[in-house]
């Protein structure tokens, strides 16, 4: 990856600020604010003070407003791992497993995050490395000032991964959909939230488990100055989604054969979970803003609640 020389390290400034989230190769789920768009794989966080009133949720969105001088960009980068000898997806356990990869990355200053005694994520200077359900490796980058900083950050991450992966005889592939293996041949990571989602997804669509185990993406999170600015950016990002899907289409293979799609990943989202996917038409209606988006959020069924370090199944609860 080639980036401009002389770009200072910006990563000590902290993690994501509130901002718009725009994804490619095919986005379909587009929550506009980073508190709602934390990666599927992101470590869980618990608010110090419980939210008891709807107005508090609106205030969370409003509190993300920033002057343009303070705007930042946060990038999320996902990729599939595979064993170099047989091309199979690595399991979590084992000498060549995903946990071994995460442990190897700690030599670069990443701090391990554990769940039930297992390392399931890494943290460093406002960024994190996390796991999607089948072990897809995700960099959730720090909040940085420019695309050049994002380029440096992603390039550094990929170089670190390549060093450790090479020692484990692993490779990584950036594509929208797993090109070779069936769903039942994909491993599952030992994370509490994923077991809940694994049980729930077949109830709301036929392709949700494929979304979890066989897709990858790149996302960008953007800041906003005012409610009006948020609305404008949200509308523009949604309007550009079909173009982004076409430009970055990269999933033409399924189980080793052409699947007839340029973006099979886009097709996956058509039958995953209608309650939380698809185009959000109400964003283009007059009067859309923080209040209307909170109404939408409150109408989406929950997956789980997280209390005292334990995931509690709340799937389907409104």
Located regions from the model:
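Compositionally biased, low-complexity intrinsically disordered regions
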Residues: 2-4, 17-18, 24-25
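Loop-rich catalytic cores of soluble enzymes, especially ATP-dependent carboxylate-amine ligases
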Residues: 172, 177-318
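Intrinsic-disorder-associated, low-complexity terminal segments enriched in Asp/Asn/His/Tyr and depleted
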Residues: 9, 16, 26-28
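Residues at the start of alpha-helices and the adjacent loop-to-helix junctions
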Residues: 13-15, 24, 212, 233
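Terminal catalytic/cofactor-binding subdomain
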Residues: 3, 30-205, 214
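Exposed, low-complexity/repetitive linear segments and helix-based recognition motifs
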Residues: 22-23, 135
């Amino acid at each position: 990856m080639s980036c401009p020389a002389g770009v200072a390290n910006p990563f000590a400034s902290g993690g994501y600020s509130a901002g718009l989230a725009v994804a490619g190769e095919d986005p379909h789920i587009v929550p506009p604010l980073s508190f709602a768009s934390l990666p599927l794989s992101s470590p869980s966080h618990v608010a110090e003070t419980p939210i008891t009133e709807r107005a508090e949720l609106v205030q969370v969105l409003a509190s993300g407003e920033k002057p343009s001088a303070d705007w930042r960009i946060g990038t999320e980068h996902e990729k599939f791992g595979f064993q170099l000898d047989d091309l199979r997806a690595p399991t979590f356990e084992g000498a060549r497993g995903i946990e071994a990869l995460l442990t190897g990355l700690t030599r670069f200053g990443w701090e391990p995050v554990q769940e039930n005694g297992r390392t399931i994520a890494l943290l460093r200077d406002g960024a994190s490395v996390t796991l999607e359900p089948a072990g897809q490796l995700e960099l959730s980058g720090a909040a940085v000032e420019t695309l050049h900083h994002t380029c440096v950050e992603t390039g550094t991450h990929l170089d670190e991964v390549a060093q450790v992966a090479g020692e484990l005889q692993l490779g990584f592939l950036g594509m929208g959909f797993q090109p070779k293996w069936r769903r039942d041949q994909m491993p599952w990571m030992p994370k509490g939230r994923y077991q809940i989602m694994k049980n729930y997804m077949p109830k709301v669509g036929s392709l949700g488990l494929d979304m979890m185990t066989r897709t990858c993406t790149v996302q960008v999170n953007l800041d906003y100055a005012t409610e009006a600015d948020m609305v404008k950016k949200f509308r523009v990002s949604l309007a550009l989604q079909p173009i982004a899907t076409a430009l970055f289409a990269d999933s033409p293979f399924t189980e080793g054969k052409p699947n007839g799609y340029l973006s099979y990943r886009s097709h996956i989202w058509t039958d995953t979970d209608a309650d939380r996917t698809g185009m959000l038409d109400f964003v283009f209606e007059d009067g859309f803003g923080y209040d209307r988006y909170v109404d939408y959020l409150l109408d989406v069924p929950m997956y789980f609640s997280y209390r005292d370090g334990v995931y509690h199944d709340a799937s389907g609860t409104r």
